[in-house]
Regions:
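A short acidic, often aromatic-flanked loop/helix-cap motif at beta-alpha or helix-coil junctions
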Residues: 1, 22-27, 45, 65, ...
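Glycine-rich P-loop/Walker A and Walker A-like loops and their local beta1-loop-alpha1 context
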Residues: 1-27, 32
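Anionic group-transfer/hydrolysis microenvironments
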Residues: 20, 73-74, 105
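Conserved nucleotide-sensing/catalytic segment adjacent to the nucleotide-binding pocket
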Residues: 27-96
């Protein structure tokens, strides 16, 4: 069982926002509506992922931006750092999501590249801040979940 499947086993009503998609990060940062172009042919899958028959996912109004779970935070941090922005600026934007899925970077290996080290460190600092605020923390590794908090 992966991290998202584990989260869905705990909460049935999750609606995930992928922050690895630059458009999604931009929309979150700017409080814009969610717009994403995806090529999917299966209509049932389209319904589950808010896709219209034209293969567009969209939410027309700001108040409809009601995602309650977020993932690929590490990619959003990288995107922000590449643009010279502060990674911790994400904290206030995502701390109130019901589920926040974090990915480990480097498995404890310190990268040689300066930017890669900074990405790893700032992502870790953001994760620490999120864990301090969290009511519950679980680590899912190789399909097994371990409750940490």
């Amino acid at each position: 069982m992966g991290k998202r499947a584990f989260a869905q086993s705990l909460y049935k009503d999750l609606k995930f926002l992928d922050l690895g998609e630059p458009d999604n990060l931009e929309n979150l940062l700017n409080n814009f509506a969610y717009i994403k172009n995806i090529k999917i042919k299966d209509e049932e899958l389209c319904k589950k992922n808010l896709l219209s028959k034209n293969n567009f996912a969209y939410v027309k109004e700001e108040e409809d931006f009601n995602f309650n779970a977020v993932f690929n935070i590490h990619l959003a941090v990288r995107n922000l750092l590449e643009r010279g922005q502060d990674a911790l600026s994400l904290f206030n934007l995502i701390k109130n999501f019901k589920v926040i899925i974090c990915d480990e970077i480097g498995a404890g290996v310190v990268p040689l590249d300066k930017f890669e080290r900074r990405w790893r460190d700032e992502t870790g600092l953001l994760y620490q801040a999120l864990v301090r605020e969290a009511d519950r923390v679980d680590r899912v590794w190789a399909g097994l979940a371990l409750r940490l908090k």
